Amino acid sequence: MAESLLELKKKIASIQKTGQITEAMRMVSGVKLNRTEKLDQEYTIYNDKVRATVSHLMSSQIVNQLGKETNEYSEFSGQSNIDYSSFFDLGTLASLVQPRKEIKSTGYLVISGDRGLVGSYNSQVIKNMMSIFKDADAQNKDVKILAVGSVAAQFFKKQNLNVVYEYSGVSDVPTYNEVRDIVQTAVKMYLNGVYDELFVCYTHHVNTLTSAFRVESMLPISDIDINHKETMPKDYIIEPDIDSVLKTVLPQFAKSMIFGAILDAKTAEHASSMTAMQSASQNADDVVSGLKTKLNRARQAQITTEITEIIGGANALE
């Protein structure tokens, strides 16, 4: 019985330590969530305005002045070191705006986490993407994957899927500069004909307990969709010229879309982590409570046995 009591005490101590760790992780995730949630809410306002501006421009007559629809890839094809600003010359703008006549390959920029202990966050990303890839395979569609986050990248490679780019190590509170390489690569691959359309796939943060998986079109830019019902003018007065305006607006659109998705996904990841650690801490408390009850019963049984033995011995002496 003494050995059993000792084992129970060891279990209680071990689980209490685990509970302390998960509680500390919950608090850390909560701090990160507060920071990213505030940034996400503020950035969403800016991001929606950029998307609305681009959507308005795409629906106006100025796009027709960029040239006829083309399936030709840009002059940057085959180059590896491209200056970011040089993406957006007039010919390249036409390539980014006009849909291609034939969709031979589809790119998916998938945002996941770099580590576990985040609840169902990563598994839901993978589950949703595998469903998309299964449908694409059934239709004999070629798929190219750009993976932001090591969890998804490693899983997709184990499944022998075509991961053409991977990026890991995004900060817990992402910065605008971090998306630079991702945007450059995504646009360059589109211009080089690696894929003919690109979708950004990520987890949208709704609230602490709720998230929603989103798949949004990024390239070609004419395919973007926004949630507004404003009456859009048929044309604009452009100053100083179309080229200058689009060279400014389209890079902002590309960066804001990817950064917004990463920031939103990080917020959802922190919320999932906090919820998971809170649940783990509560489970640890419940297990400890059950073990303490079991320990007290074992102690009571031990005391009862000892008293019975003492009484029995005393009676034997009479």
From Swiss-Prot:
Keyword Membrane tagged: yes
Biological role: Produces ATP from ADP in the presence of a proton gradient across the membrane. The gamma chain is believed to be important in regulating ATPase activity and the flow of protons through the CF(0) complex.
Protein name stated in the entry: ATP synthase gamma chain
Single GO biological process annotation from the record: proton motive force-driven plasma membrane ATP synthesis
Topology versus the membrane: Peripheral membrane protein
Subunit structure: F-type ATPases have 2 components, CF(1) - the catalytic core - and CF(0) - the membrane proton channel. CF(1) has five subunits: alpha(3), beta(3), gamma(1), delta(1), epsilon(1). CF(0) has three main subunits: a, b and c.
Keywords: ATP synthesis, Cell membrane, CF(1), Hydrogen ion transport, Ion transport, Membrane, Transport
Family: Belongs to the ATPase gamma chain family.
Biological source species: Lactobacillus johnsonii (strain CNCM I-12250 / La1 / NCC 533)
Gene Ontology CC: one annotated term: proton-transporting ATP synthase complex
Main location: membrane
Top-level division of the source organism's lineage: Bacteria
Subcellular location: Cell membrane
GO molecular function: ATP binding; proton-transporting ATP synthase activity, rotational mechanism
The UniProt record lists the keyword Lyase: no
